[in-house]
Amino acid sequence: MEGSMKNYATIREILEKEYRVDDLKPLAKMLCDIVPAKKDDLVRAICSAISGDGLKKAFSLLHPLQQSALAEAVHVHGGDFDGSRFAAKYGSSARKTLSEQQKMHDTPWNLFIWSGALPGDLQGRLAEFVPKPKDDELNVLDELPERILIDDDTGEIRDEDVTEENGLPLQVRHTDRPALNNLLAILRLVDRGKIKVGPKTGHPTGATTTLISGILDGGDWYIPGEEPDDFNNYSEIGPIQAFAWPLLLQGGGLANADGSTLRLTRAGKAALNENLPDAVRSLWKKWEKTTFFDEFSRINAIRGQTAAHRRHMISPATRRPVINAALEECPPGKWVDFDEFSRFMCSQDFRFYVARDLWRLYISEPQYGSLGYAGFGKWSIVEGRYLLAYLFEYMATLGLIDVAYLPPDGVRDDFRGNWGTDGLLYLSRYDGLQYFRINPLGAFVLGKVSAYESVLPEASPGLKVLPNFDIVAMDRTSLSGADVMYLSSIADKTADAVWHISPATLLRAAERGVLPDDILSFLNTRSAEPMPQTVSTLLADTKSRVAKFSYLGAGHLLACSDPMLVKLVASHRSLSSLCVAADDRYLCMLPGKEKAFLKALTELGYVVPHLRDMIER
């Protein structure tokens, strides 16, 4: 029997064109009372044997695992046998067993599946009696183990024989409320022009990631200096949340790069004063479609991504919707093992692809380390690492999923068979992610619930506002980075936990768009005591002063040598609404009225040399 990639409509065609006599005789011995000697007679005998109820007999001769594989092909995959999906549902060992059974030729397996597909004339008949396979289910947890053990041979999590001595403690982070605090803090940094990015890449600079790391509520996932014993220096992992935030703001439409500085868009400015969960939902919808950044580029150990203008890379905008669709199967509030989620995605055909040509991607060296070699670019190494980055660096940073993780060192060894990996402690900085859970913010953003309601306890009021205009932080732990930054924008810091407001600080804040009503609301929500009258009066006075002036736009100042002409133009019926007199020798054209003013002035018999060219440039 010789291999072929042809698809045949009938079993007779396969037997006639693809089987030799030596292949047909074992089948005939299993199915026929008499085994003919000639090929044509063998084909007729086998086809006759599987007519009517004979097909059921042939099916009954299969091993149970083969029967399951055939059931998947008949009822789930439209007549195709998908080995990778079968392995994802039944386990890699099941696929190996299936392959070994096929080589034994002790069942009529090859009668049913040829070149990965059923003959067309058998599919309908088999569907009548082959039992439907059980639906695959995503296994979830209500509670996490405190410690886990990674099997050295399989890389799988073990839940037995775990002790305090050999088990690894999970770091668990609840992300929704900290992420909202972080979003507000970073929006304020952008508003102050403090976020710097590469003008071509949009990636945050080193100074910017350091700045953001210092104000993150709860800190980044891996904080240098807090490493457990026997683990690598966290500083080598690099920033994760601090790197992601500027990219999320840009890809989510809240900020744009103006040279090397991020500036808030109209949506970003609105997010400063609107419902933050709604802003996160809008950002995430835009992020799904953005092509401005590819999360896979953060898998630094896999090189060759930028070759040939990235034409071999598939757009991330095609990957994210597939992952988000798979997340629909995750019940909110339940913990999901990452490997289980990855398995489930393969089993249920939530497939996406990172590259068109894996030969261009490599580890360490292009020739020997290419991911094009069999097994070198498998799902867990390529698509699985993208999935880790997507969940850990972007979804968790934005507060959509809670995470439980370990240091990445040695947690995932699926890449150890690849050439050039001996010196790698991990393939990606995200290898430590073990479990995730869709939290209330994630359920809202992903459309599972209609409103966001955090299950985290409300932070206790942490500020006390004094009559002498001091603001004292009574509980620093209850203040987020966003709160501290806001206080610094409205007051002068006079001690470690004390800020002082004054007319000067309030006017300075108002110039940047932080108005007295916003300040009053901020202080009221973070103070357990009534606002002192002195502070209320100061805020009211500042509000009155701020309301006296408003900006209408930039005008053009014109000098006139004739005071009488200034009066004439300023009072003329066609020009009076387009300008105002400034003293008796100046006129100011109103913003947006320049062209109309120059036209009316020309009709009056006067011009301003060169001004029209300047305006029309």
Feature-to-residue mapping (PLM):
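Short, amphipathic alpha-helical interface elements at domain boundaries
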Residues: 1-379, 460-480, 485-489, 494, ...
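Extended alpha-helical interface modules used as scaffolds for assembling large macromolecular complexes
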Residues: 174-190, 283-617
